[in-house]
Curated annotation (Swiss-Prot):
Activates KDO (a required 8-carbon sugar) for incorporation into bacterial lipopolysaccharide in Gram-negative bacteria. PANTHER family: 3-DEOXY-MANNO-OCTULOSONATE CYTIDYLYLTRANSFERASE, 3-DEOXY-MANNO-OCTULOSONATE CYTIDYLYLTRANSFERASE, MITOCHONDRIAL. Keywords: Cytoplasm, Lipopolysaccharide biosynthesis, Nucleotidyltransferase, Transferase. One of its GO terms (biological process) is CMP-keto-3-deoxy-D-manno-octulosonic acid biosynthetic process. It comes from Legionella pneumophila (strain Corby). InterPro entries: Cytidylyl_trans, KdsB, Nucleotide-diphossugar_trans. SUPFAM superfamilies: Nucleotide-diphospho-sugar transferases. GO terms for cellular component: cytosol. Its main location: cytoplasm. This is 3-deoxy-manno-octulosonate cytidylyltransferase. One of its GO terms (molecular function) is 3-deoxy-manno-octulosonate cytidylyltransferase activity. It is found in: Cytoplasm.
Length: 250
């Protein structure tokens, strides 16, 4: 049974911290293929890999994926998936889920959740969050934090610790980290990437701030399952390989 949404996986080879990470293997299967397999388990109408790299494209075609070759000039994965939407035959209201290419253990239920959330909100974008479990995570600038309204719409995203506990600097209660999984309406996605970057976005290096800056809302729900680690470094890959061995022995 397929659900009424599409998954597009932006797949960039030249990652700044770990070039070629999507072609690294976890128990004989590349990271990008594992992401693709997890996306299929969410039962979308389609799964497309968007890349500008020949080797990624060739490997994806070999394991049966639909591939769209995109420009090598894109600055973000969102720009890359928008090119796929612009080239395709998507309806304006089609739900497009952006699944990062470096999440080999992305939970299918989270993909379904973020897509379903978009169909139940007037916001043009939906995403997820998860409670922060330590002060170290809260203070890590590589972990994006989010604060929301009482009706689950984003007030702000930041690399800083938000909200700031003035009277207890060791507290991290009621703090949430953002999960970089998005669902967009196709028409809004194309509109979004046409806007120039805003000042806050450039300061924080967080493109979702462009949406809030422009006066649109982002629906944020707490994930139904705890998200697993993505792969940003060689150390993350080693942890992912060990995690696979651990779950294989359960």
């Amino acid at each position: 049974m397929s659900h009424n949404f599409h998954v597009i996986i932006p797949a960039r080879y030249h990652s700044s911290r770990f070039p070629g990470k999507l072609l690294q293997e976890i128990n004989g299967i590349t990271v990008i293929e594992r992401v693709y397999r997890q996306a299929l388990l969410a039962e979308p109408k389609s799964v497309i890999i968007a890349t500008d790299h020949d080797e990624i494209a060739d490997r994806a075609i070999q394991f049966g994926a639909e591939v769209v070759i995109t420009s090598h000039t894109h600055q973000t994965g969102t720009d890359r998936i928008a090119e796929v939407v612009a080239k395709g035959s998507f309806a304006p209201d089609d739900v497009i889920v952006n699944v990062q290419g470096d999440e080999p253990f992305i939970r299918p239920k989270l993909i379904q959740q973020v897509a379903c959330s978009l169909t139940k909100t007037k916001a043009p974008v939906s995403t997820l969050c998860w409670p922060i479990s330590s002060l170290e995570i809260l203070n890590n600038p590589n972990v994006v934090k989010v604060v929301c309204t009482r009706d689950n719409h984003a007030l702000y995203f930041s690399r800083s610790a938000i909200p700031y506990h003035r009277d207890n600097k060791s507290a991290y209660s009621n703090t949430f980290r953002h999960i970089g999984l998005y669902a967009y309406r196709a028409a809004f996605l194309l509109e979004f990437v046409s806007w120039p970057p805003c000042t806050l976005e450039q300061i924080e290096c967080l493109e979702q701030l462009r949406i809030l800056w422009s006066g649109f809302s982002i629906r944020v729900d707490e994930a139904c399952e705890e998200p697993l680690q993505d792969i940003n470094t060689k150390e993350d890959l080693i942890l992912a390989q060990q995690y696979f061995l651990d779950i294989s022995n359960i």
